[in-house]
């Protein structure tokens, strides 16, 4: 039986399952010693559903390289800092050989990604992506409350429900406010409805409580300037929170996706739509934005709040990509427990030439 290093893989579900194999040794593929190893037949069993999404192309001109597509489409699967890309074909071929239930021709020939080769799936995925654009246009310029074309709400509901994470009672979150005047702990929550401007998640006049998962992220989100005074509020969940997690959809590992309850091919069909929702929520508010720009995400967040009954959404911070934000609909479930007064001592900017359009 052959083995490879467990940490070649990024998918948290593979890492979790692989922890039961405690035999350290040398990985012949990454040329590293004293690393935790995992047997190749086990990897074949775990990865079978992923590689079953590929088939041999009818002609070389129509096909794609398996390794290239896996790395591009599933960036949450393999860690290229642990293994050279040029070694991956040999590793995957030996996984196929050791497992004995996969088509080794996928390595040596050009392949097609079957969900995209299926015309019905192409039409479905294309329709979902174009529906986002149609939804945006209709909400902005035609109908605000009653749409002329309905989305596939049953499928969207199923996908969003599978992305729910329970944030346990006692969890800590943070919010920063800029002010030269004293802000009391009782004032650190969401703004009053008469002062609530439109946000990515909330409509004008309907405030949500925007929190960050760590202090650094909320500092970035506040966009405080040098020497400005910041009030940092620490919030605690008074009860469990059911949050739809939309952060880093594109980096979900394929085994992790199945562990969440998705059929892998079905997830592929909805992936673009979920990524679009995630990306739109993550975009920072800009001065040039119109309130109209936020209508599609507001509409879907209201669906998550009012129809599905969840407590909020979580999404990646555009201001601090290593952190994430939460829009809490039911703010009575969290409480500000502490406020610190801070001063900005340093601000750094990174700029690049603007691309011509």
Residue ranges and their predicted role:
Residues 1-170, 175-202, 225-357:
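Active-site and NAD+-binding cores of ADP-ribose-processing enzymes
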């Amino acid at each position: 039986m052959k083995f490879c290093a467990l940490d070649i893989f990024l998918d948290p579900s593979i890492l979790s399952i692989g922890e039961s194999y405690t035999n350290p040794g040398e990985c012949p593929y990454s040329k590293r010693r004293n690393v935790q190893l995992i047997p190749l037949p086990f990897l074949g069993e775990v990865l079978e559903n992923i590689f079953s999404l590929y088939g041999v192309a009818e002609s070389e001109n129509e096909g794609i390289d398996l390794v290239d597509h896996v790395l591009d489409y599933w960036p949450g699967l393999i860690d290229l800092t642990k293994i050279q890309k040029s070694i991956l074909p040999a590793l995957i071929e030996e996984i196929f050989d050791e497992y004995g239930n996969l088509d080794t021709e996928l390595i040596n020939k050009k392949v097609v990604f079957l969900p995209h080769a299926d015309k019905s799936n192409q039409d479905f995925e294309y329709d979902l992506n174009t529906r986002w654009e149609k939804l945006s246009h209709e909400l902005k310029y035609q109908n605000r409350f009653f749409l002329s074309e309905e989305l596939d709400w049953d499928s969207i509901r199923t996908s969003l429900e599978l992305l729910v994470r329970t944030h346990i009672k006692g969890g800590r979150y943070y919010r920063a406010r800029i002010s030269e005047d004293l802000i009391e702990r009782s004032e650190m929550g969401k703004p009053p409805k008469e002062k609530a401007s439109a946000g990515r998640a909330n409509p004008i006049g309907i405030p949500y409580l925007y929190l960050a998962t760590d202090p650094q992220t909320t500092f970035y989100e506040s966009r405080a300037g040098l020497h400005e005074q910041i009030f940092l509020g620490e919030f605690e969940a008074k009860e469990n929170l059911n949050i739809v997690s939309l952060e880093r959809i594109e980096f979900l590992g394929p085994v992790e996706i199945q562990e969440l309850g998705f059929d892998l091919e079905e997830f592929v069909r909805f992936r673009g739509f979920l990524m679009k929702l995630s990306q739109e929520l993550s975009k920072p508010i800009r001065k040039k934005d119109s309130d109209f720009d936020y209508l599609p995400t507001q509409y879907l967040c209201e669906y998550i709040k009012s129809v599905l009954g969840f407590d909020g959404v979580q999404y990646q911070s555009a201001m601090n990509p290593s952190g994430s934000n939460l829009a809490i609909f039911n703010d009575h479930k969290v409480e500000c427990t502490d406020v610190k007064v801070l001063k900005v001592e340093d601000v750094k900017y990174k700029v690049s030439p603007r691309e011509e359009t």
